[in-house]
Every structure is written in C-alpha cells, then in structure tokens.
Amino acid sequence: MSTRAPVELDFLGLRAAAADADDRHAKSGGSSASSSSSIRGMETSAIARIGPHLLRRVIAAARPPPPPSTAPVPEEMPGAAAAAAPMTLFYNGSVAVFDVSHDKAEAIMRMATEATKAKGLARGNAIVGNFAKEPLTRTKSLQRFLSKRKERLTSLGPYQVGGPAAVGATTSTTTKSFLAKEEEHTAS
C-alpha cells in the first residue's frame, strides 16, 4: 500500500519569499536553512512567518487572497451559460435524461411548479368534498372508541379516588388516595 505525499498550497506566496531569503542568507555567508528549519526544537511554519497584520486580514476575509499575478485567473466564458447540461426528470415511474441549457431548465421547472400548484388547489377542494359526504357512523364509532379508552385509562390510574366499586373490584379492602395515605403517615 503506497502512501501519498501531502499536498501543500502556497496561497500567500511564502515559498518564493522564503527561497529568496534563503538565497540572500547563503550569499551573505550564513548556513542555508530550509523552510522547515528548527529553531530551539520548534519547527517554524508558514503561519509563524506571516506578518500579524497580513494574518488578521487573511483570517477575516471570506475567501483566500487572489493568487499571485503569475497564475492565470480563469475567466467565465460567454458560451458557458448556453452550454447544455444533463437534466434528469422522474415522471410516472420512468427516468428520462435530457441535455438542456440552464435557461430552458429553469423554464421547465417553473412550468412544472405552476402546474403542480394548480392541481393541488383543485385536488384540495375534491378532498374536502369527499369528507363532507362521508357518513356520520365513522365519527360516532370514533367517539365511542375514545370514550371507552378514556374509561380504561382512568380505571388503571395509580391514584384511585372512588374506592373498589368504581374500579369494579370485588375485594373488601378499601383503596385510599395518595393524599389520604400521606396524611396518615405524617400524623403518626
């Protein structure tokens, strides 16, 4: 398994400045130091060599500064906007891919949105009409179900107030509420 070397991008052009400084230092008779030389056991990084005012400006900027003038700046081509790009449509269980320009794709999406909104309004009125025609037996059945469920939940509650007759128990032991038990406990 081969390992790839890390890629370093010199956004601020510091490699060229460091190389110039190394050349000047070598010409003056000093020993040549590379850009990763050690000073007292610490490696100097590119950020350590940047001036504080320049570093603040780079950090505050939303984008990195523009590349040096030697790098060509890509310009937008006027024909790029008219270039066709693939557009995928999913309709009625099928998938279709077309090469369409950006303007035509926007027009298609706008037309589909308007058609969907118009169908949604018409369909919404039809749904409301169907519920109005529905018989009341379902709503009455639902009300009966909810009332029985409420009765079951209240009968199984942890604090039964009504005694055994309310719950339907046949034992002779009496059930006291939580507050009554607490009052007996504090009184003793």
From Swiss-Prot:
Residue ranges, annotated region (Disordered): 20-41, 156-188
Post-translational modification: Ubiquitinated. Targeted for degradation by the SCF(COI1) E3 ubiquitin ligase-proteasome pathway during jasmonate signaling.
PROSITE patterns linked: TIFY
Record motif Jas, residues: 135-160
Pfam families xref list: Jas_motif, tify
Domain Tify: 80-114
Leader sequence residues: none
InterPro entries in the cross-refs: CCT_CS (IPR018467), TIFY/JAZ (IPR040390), Tify_dom (IPR010399)
Record field: compositional bias (Low complexity): 28-38
Regions of compositional bias (Basic and acidic residues) in chain numbering: 179-188
Keywords associated with the record: Jasmonic acid signaling pathway, Transcription, Transcription regulation, Ubl conjugation
One Gene Ontology cellular component annotation held by this UniProt entry: nucleus
S-adenosyl-L-methionine found in the keyword field: no
Alphabetical GO biological process terms: regulation of defense response; regulation of jasmonic acid mediated signaling pathway; response to wounding
Free-text comment on this protein's domains from its UniProt entry: The jas domain (135-160) is required for interaction with COI1.
Function: Repressor of jasmonate responses.
Family: Belongs to the TIFY/JAZ family.
Protein name per Swiss-Prot or TrEMBL: Protein TIFY 9
